[in-house]
């Protein structure tokens, strides 16, 4: 069973992602702010992190930078989950160090496939 941290401030989005992952047999951890996500990642060292970009305290990009400072978390894949559909925003997100971008609203099949791919293969770039 994989341990996946979901960092998402929207209750409906959190529930959808949590329910999908738990249905697929994964253990989930939850955080609703960027700093809480960083703390949870440090405390629990998940197998995968799903990070919203727009969070109430710090951005997902800022949270990712703090996560990547931790030696134990450098190999953990972090996937950005965002409603931003502008190509330049998506490019900024990916060049910030995220391993992949998942657009909201979530396409369930693509979402599950992406999660499974990263759980199987790990980070594509270290």
Please give the residue ranges for each predicted region:
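Active-site residues of response regulator receiver
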Residues: 52, 82
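C-terminal output helix
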Residues: 106-116
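Two-component/phosphorelay signaling modules centered on CheY-like receiver
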Residues: 11-29, 96
